[in-house]
UniProtKB/Swiss-Prot annotation:
Native organism taxonomy: Viruses, Varidnaviria, Bamfordvirae, Nucleocytoviricota, Pokkesviricetes
PROSITE patterns (alphabetical): DNA_POLYMERASE_B
Gene responsible for this protein: OPG071
Keyword Membrane attached: no
Catalytic activity: DNA(n) + a 2'-deoxyribonucleoside 5'-triphosphate = DNA(n+1) + diphosphate
EC number, UniProt record: 2.7.7.7, 3.1.11.-
Subunit note: Interacts with OPG148. Component of the Uracil-DNA glycosylase(UDG)-OPG148-polymerase complex; OPG148 and OPG116/UDG form a heterodimeric processivity factor that associates with OPG071 to form the processive polymerase holoenzyme.
Protein name: DNA polymerase
Keywords: DNA recombination, DNA replication, DNA-binding, DNA-directed DNA polymerase, Early protein, Hydrolase, Multifunctional enzyme, Nucleotidyltransferase, Transferase, Viral DNA replication
Amino acid sequence: MDVRCINWFESHGENRFLYLKSRCRNGETVFIRFPHYFYYVVTDEIYQSLAPPPFNARPMGKMRTIDIDETISYNLDIKDRKCSVADMWLIEEPKKRNIQNATMDEFLNISWFYISNGISPDGCYSLDDQYLTKINNGCYHCGDPRNCFAKEIPRFDIPRSYLFLDIECHFDKKFPSVFINPISHTSYCYIDLSGKRLLFTLINEEMLTEQEIQEAVDRGCLRIQSLMEMDYERELVLCSEIVLLQIAKQLLELTFDYIVTFNGHNFDLRYITNRLELLTGEKIIFRSPDKKEAVHLCIYERNQSSHKGVGGMANTTFHVNNNNGTIFFDLYSFIQKSEKLDSYKLDSISKNAFSCMGKVLNRGVREMTFIGDDTTDAKGKAAVFAKVLTTGNYVTVDDIICKVIHKDIWENGFKVVLSCPTLTNDTYKLSFGKDDVDLAQMYKDYNLNIALDMARYCIHDACLCQYLWEYYGVETKTDAGASTYVLPQSMVFGYKASTVIKGPLLKLLLETKTILVRSETKQKFPYEGGKVFAPKQKMFSNNVLIFDYNSLYPNVCIFGNLSPETLVGVVVSSNRLEEEINNQLLLQKYPPPRYITVHCEPRLPNLISEIAIFDRSIEGTIPRLLRTFLAERARYKKMLKQATSSTEKAIYDSMQYTYKIIANSVYGLMGFRNSALYSYASAKSCTSIGRRMILYLESVLNGAELSNGMLRFANPLSNPFYMDDRDINPIVKTSLPIDYRFRFRSVYGDTDSVFTEIDSQDVDKSIEIAKELERLINSRVLFNNFKIEFEAVYKNLIMQSKKKYTTMKYSASSNSKSVPERINKGTSETRRDVSKFHKNMIKIYKTRLSEMLSEGRMNSNQVCIDILRSLETDLRSEFDSRSSPLELFMLSRMHHLNYKSADNPNMYLVTEYNKNNPETIELGERYYFAYICPANVPWTKKLVNIKTYETIIDRSFKLGSDQRIFYEVYFKRLTSEIVNLLDNKVLCISFFERMFGSRPTFYEA
């Protein structure tokens, strides 16, 4: 029997078992049950003394145990690390057992199962039937997984089954209550193993009149009285709420491969199961494949107070306790972990994921026709957009929400007619954002037409789950994660990096016959992070070349052989004499290149120096782990280039991405005290070496010159750690034309990247030169495993401060005719606590600055004068006209209790609001507010007690005739950001004092 592993899960009854859900080549699903064991590693001496004898035991052979406690010394008399070799045993017990002096107990039992039996969680195997005992049709027991799964075979494709769902609930206040608010709609996107896709929506007929029900039937809706009458081929079905819930129960109890929702763990599934029990007394029941265990659907929460989210709220995750092999997947929590977005509402995520440039085909009376295909945007974008459009009801044109009037869809494109004001441009960005509907009002005015409209919105949201599932490649990422992390598919996204690293680490330790132990308590001290340079200036009319180190921290660990067991010791000094003596003797006792000495910042205030010494003769655990990850990533990237099918490409892309993420997480885990890889000295040395590497690259580029086909680097090409046999001559021959004459200047850098200005505004030449620079830096400047990559040309770069800049980006693969990408890093455009007015204005002024830089007609003083004069005109005009809507000035904030002071004004604001409003603001909820003052207040220069002008804005708020927006608060914040874009501080201070009566705050460089 040839099978592919698709999920692993456990039963937690009196007799615990591990189950595999697998699929054969013919699409048949097969479950295999294994005994569940707890694993313990002991020495031969302890094994022989155990009473009663262990249930099962496997010899592990001789293994080396290394004590990895850090040795701290004030001199070079460092004791050798404790190390011993002994025969070890792996013990398997069906129940937990207290065994003294067991080691390697930090690893997961499931990882032990896979590794000890040589099984890959997502592998394909030809099973040996003699080790299988049939339990029932489609379920077998296996007591010897090692022999049963001995023959691994090449991967083969299999079909999967899915259920994507969404619900709508009646509500009359802010949020539906399961006790009083019925479910009005449930929509499903059902995909079976044959690939057949069914879309259907159930409508609660109890919310309609009998006349409306009859009209719905006349218009083609199916009306049913019981579960048995359900026809899944019909798109719209009317039934009672009880039947609606019974159908939900039947569907959720089926063994799909995936049941996918958006925030369904916290709401949809919980609401369905609670409503079902309330109305019928029934529960949703899952049964294990052997039919021996039944469990009720229950949502349980994990609160990780050690990982607090925004506003001090504990990181809470929600989980479904099923035992039938279905993976219940919540896209909301997945996207929260994998994407950094302004908002995690479904409409915001959709807008980010599904967009396409559309061409205006026709302009009518308050309607416009757009067409999208491979000629209007990058190949494939229109096809994806068209797929979402099949169920879409609204399309966002730039920021205007437009209702779909008509749509034509074909394989690689679409034509859509939108209810839209007349727009003048020829092309616009189309996206799927928020449907322009007010559900509260719809329920208030509820009738048949509204019910049918809501059915369309509901099925679109269910289908959006499918579209997002495919967009994020969740299935291939799940399989890739299972293989890489040595975890079941159902657990891949449930753990943090400190846990997922344990599988690969255990695998490596067993391969190298190594056990790492600690006898002392782990200590945590702060240490300096990556090097961030101060920007040399604010605005750049010349192009700036961006060079990034490839996987800097992983390669630092490999270069320095940084690992807890390769650390010889840490030498500290409390006075200058000690430091001088230690420095003189250090290189004699620990000469490079076998050893590397890393100067770090002292861990305690009474110390003046700290030097970590690492032995580079034998590769350590962390470097070996990283080398494996990077090699595997390179292998999958190569396979990705050679792949022919879309399935192969998706798998290989997910695999290379997974290895990239896990390799980059290792540095963080070295400094995380609860991690199995914790090594304070290694983490600290990693950032120290990283800083020296970025400083070294900056030193050779800052002041470099290109002329006559020769590149003169600014400094000798000397290894910053020790002398080697490389040629250090800074003059290097290039393959560039001899008439090229350019100078280079380093203007900024951050951790692993260097921003180098070239005295040219020609994009094509800049890219050509940068690619040659990349080649020369990698071949002549860098050494060992360090490499850099030319990432992009930044044109019209505007540096606000460290980590804050705006620019037009030309990627390394583009040219001057390419459309550049606008980049806003760390600026107000990407923040949620900034008003739309602020974002719109700052975008306008950055664009204007960018154009001025591009034209090059003005010096920095003229630019400053022109910008400030224009800004004053715009602000005065807005203040006098007061024409912009309140929506542009709304801000949002999360309500929480994480305030130092009990009488915090934010808390007071919400408390007072809740006293006077039936729709209260709950903990963890975001609310909108604005600064409002009396209408007769003149322009206020000095702003004091501005918190007292905060007003919560809800659906019912209307700005009174005796009120105005307190514009000055917003204007001051906007002006503060704009003056930080300009170079002339004197002019900026003068302008700010005249407008607001105080000096501006300039960002730290």
